[in-house]
UniProtKB/Swiss-Prot annotation:
Family as reported in the entry's similarity comment: Belongs to the ATPase alpha/beta chains family.
Highest taxon in the source lineage: Bacteria
Membrane topology: Peripheral membrane protein
Organism: Stenotrophomonas maltophilia (strain K279a)
Name of this protein: ATP synthase subunit beta
Cystines in this chain: none
Organism lineage: Bacteria, Pseudomonadati, Pseudomonadota, Gammaproteobacteria, Lysobacterales
GO cellular component, one term: proton-transporting ATP synthase complex
UniProt function note: Produces ATP from ADP in the presence of a proton gradient across the membrane. The catalytic sites are hosted primarily by the beta subunits.
PROSITE patterns listed in its UniProt record: ATPASE_ALPHA_BETA (PS00152)
Keyword Translocase among record annotations: yes
HAMAP family: ATP_synth_beta_bact
């Protein structure tokens, strides 16, 4: 155990000098004596000096304090003992329920599974949310990104997916709260507790008020716990299927940006760290499914100023199997979930994977919506009356489709007062197929707003007719 002493402190970055023959390796964890603070080595500057990031507040640190090299990277508890617990970036419990009774601890910096060990994802994962199941279906063992600006519903969508998938899914879940609001973390804990699935969820939080070092590493802590569940073989020699929820991946990038300049790196485009693509790749390449078990990850991605070409969301796009793009213009119409069906994509959109009926219905829905989008300018200038009969019909169907994409959420019951709806995939396909086939051309578009299946829309239309 070599010892060094602190020689410089700049915000979250601390320089420590060691004897030349015992300089720590990059990513080694150092413990500052008589404090709770852990430092992670980022660079070797020469002459025995290493530059580190503090995982915790550097208040109270001073020069010449002794830092001890632990000789290994940051290690966190893994295994069944983490389930039902809330931990911080170092795996320490923050739920006041005593120490974490874990049988093992793993380092958070690990290699991604080799190419031979990985297995492709083709099995569909039903979410019960119409617009997602139809337009950008998820794969079991795939990676999903929820893209959206501030206040368009990323976290609510994430919570609904957790509600619909994690509760129905018999496997285990890991939730990593990266730089988000503490209130949301608290809400999530109580949501899980109330629905009696807390004993299947491990929670790791590094919230907005934490120093950048914590926010930069907390995603890796959560991922390491998920990897353990995936890789640890049970009596049948198989790992588990794990759900990994990350809210929010953008804050991971942002924490890297905050420490990058302090580490002496030149900023790149828009002030991001020059290592942005590599940092994102290191995290994303580990979130994958192997022949042993699977990790299905759902990540919320904040889009700064609603600009999808910003380097951070643009870098994230490359790693995902499905992208769900939330649109402010759709949210402003009062249609929730505010998913943009023309901007959301999925690699599963292949007739050989999802079946011909699903694929054809989705394509026709997309064509109808695209036609409506093109006609919007004409409608704005000349009005609906100038359109041909065929175009009027397309517009009418597109508006019904838009409204039918809305649906009441279980997690929003408290605010909306209407009970949440889970719509099975076959009902979703049947409903949209009927709309594009013109079976419901006679119903008013308002009947399709905030309902579950197509039967509810028909029922709502009847009630509206009776009132009229």
């Amino acid at each position: 155990m070599s010892q060094g002493k602190i020689v410089q402190i700049i915000g979250a970055v601390v320089d420590v000098e060691f004897p030349r023959e015992s300089v720590p390796k990059v990513y080694d964890a150092l413990k500052v004596e008589n404090t709770e603070i852990t430092l992670e080595v980022q660079q070797q500057l020469g002459d025995g000096v290493v530059r580190t990031i503090a995982l915790g507040s550097t208040d109270g640190l001073k020069r010449n304090l002794v830092a001890v090299n632990t000789g290994r990277g940051i290690s966190v508890p893994v295994g069944a003992g983490t389930l039902g617990r809330i931990m911080d970036v170092l795996g320490r419990p923050i739920d006041e329920a005593g120490p974490v009774a874990a049988s093992d601890s793993w380092e958070i910096h690990r290699a991604a599974p080799s190419y031979e060990d990985q297995s492709p994802a083709t099995e569909l994962l039903e979410t019960g949310i119409k617009v997602i199941d139809l337009m950008c279906p998820f794969a079991k063992g795939g990676k999903v990104g929820l893209f959206g600006g501030a206040g368009v519903g990323k976290t609510v969508n994430m919570m609904e997916l957790i509600n619909n998938i994690a509760k129905a899914h018999s496997g285990l879940s890991v939730f990593a709260g990266v730089g988000e609001r503490t209130r949301e973390g608290n809400d999530f804990y109580h949501e899980m507790k109330d629905s009696n699935v807390l004993d299947k969820v491990a929670m790791v939080y590094g919230q907005m008020n934490e120093p950048p070092g914590n926010r930069l590493r907390v995603a890796l802590t959560g991922l390491t716990m998920a990897e353990y569940f995936r890789d640890e073989k049970d009596e049948n020699g198989k790992g588990k299927d794990v759900l990994l929820f990350v809210d929010n991946i953008y804050r991971y990038t942002l924490a890297g940006t905050e420490v990058s300049a302090l580490l002496g790196r030149m900023p790149s485009a828009v002030g991001y760290q020059p290592t942005l693509a590599e940092e994102m790749g290191v995290l994303q390449e580990r979130i994958t499914s192997t022949k042993n078990g699977s990790i299905t990850s759902i990540q919320a991605v904040y889009v700064p100023a609603d600009d999808l070409t910003d380097p951070s969301p643009a870098t994230t796009f490359a790693h995902l199997d499905s992208t769900v793009t939330l649109s402010r213009s759709i949210a402003s119409l009062g249609i929730y979930p505010a998913v943009d069906p023309l901007d959301s994509t999925s690699r599963q959109m292949d007739p050989l994977v999802i079946g011909h009926e699903h694929y054809d219905t989705a394509q026709r829905v997309q064509q109808t919506l695209q036609k409506y989008k093109e006609l919007k300018d004409i409608i704005a200038i000349l009005g609906m009356d100038e359109l041909s009969e065929e175009d009027k019909q397309a517009v009418s169907r597109a508006r019904k489709i838009e409204r039918f994409f809305s649906q009441p959420f279980h997690v929003a019951e408290v605010f909306t007062g209407s009970p949440g709806k889970y719509v099975p995939l076959k009902d979703t396909i049947r409903g949209f197929k009927a709309i594009v086939d013109g079976e419901y051309d006679h119903l008013p578009e308002q009947a399709f707003y905030m309902v579950g299946g197509i039967e509810e829309a028909v029922e709502k239309a009847k009630k509206m007719a009776e009132k009229a």
